[in-house]
């Protein structure tokens, strides 16, 4: 289970509910929102959730110049490093859109891009029950579910989805566990070596 675009005013409530259920998730965060909700980001990390990069401002990378993409990544890395003393190795590129230029940049900064297999369409549906029904229709197991912790309806639907899947004996893991990779590096210079 993954969440993009946060943290937001709804994220702490989501974390509390997930903590009660002992469910770890991966948050792909926007640097500009981490600046607005630093305590929420720290709470997410401290409660065993994984933090990945989404970008700083959610701009479409394919429309940016190379140096602008590096800036989106580096700025977010610096913010996260200052808060949790670590730098993520995972990124979800905004809109999931990549090209050769982006692949090269991600390789240069040692980031693994993570897409999804089930898009909850929560950004479009904006109704708790419709989001829940939509995800349950497409879930097969071993899925990476994309949700957004920036909508109250998404957070409510996420808890319904978690409870239903737990009742069906599903297990939840972070992305780094799922793809068997290291989730963080200790030194920011290890990941931001340019070109």
Region locations from a protein language model:
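Active-site beta->alpha N-cap acidic-glycine motif
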Residues: 1-64, 68-82, 86, 171, ...
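A cross-domain feature marking catalytic cores of carbohydrate-active enzymes
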Residues: 3, 29-31, 53-55, 93-95, ...
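Conserved, mostly hydrophobic/aromatic
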Residues: 4, 18, 51-54, 76, ...
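Active-site environment of divalent metal-dependent phosphoester hydrolases
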Residues: 8-10, 35-36, 58-60, 97-101, ...
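C-terminal domain-boundary segment and adjacent tail
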Residues: 20-21, 34-35, 153-195
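Non-membrane alpha-helical structural segments and their capping/turn regions in soluble enzymes
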Residues: 66-71, 129, 152-155
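His/Asp/Glu-enriched short active-site or ligand-binding loop at hydrolase and phosphoryl-transfer sites
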Residues: 87, 97, 103-138, 170-182
């Amino acid at each position: 289970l993954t969440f993009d675009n946060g943290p937001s005013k709804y994220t702490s409530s989501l974390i509390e509910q997930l903590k009660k259920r002992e469910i770890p998730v991966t948050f792909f965060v926007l640097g500009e929102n981490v600046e607005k909700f630093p305590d929420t980001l720290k709470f997410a990390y401290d409660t065993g959730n994984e933090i990945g990069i989404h970008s700083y401002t959610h701009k479409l990378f394919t429309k940016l110049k190379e140096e602008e993409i590096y800036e989106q990544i580096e700025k977010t890395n610096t913010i996260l490093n200052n808060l949790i003393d670590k730098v993520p190795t995972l990124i979800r590129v905004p809109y999931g859109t990549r090209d050769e230029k982006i692949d090269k940049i991600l390789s240069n900064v040692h980031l693994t891009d993570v897409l999804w297999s089930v898009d909850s369409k929560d950004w479009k549906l904006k109704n708790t029950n419709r989001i829940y029904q939509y995800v349950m229709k497409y879930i097969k197991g071993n899925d990476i579910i994309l949700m957004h912790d920036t909508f109250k309806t998404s957070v409510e639907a996420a808890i319904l989805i978690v409870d239903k899947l737990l009742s069906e004996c599903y297990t939840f893991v972070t992305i780094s566990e799922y793809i068997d990779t290291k989730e963080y590096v200790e030194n920011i210079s290890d990941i931001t070596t340019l070109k």
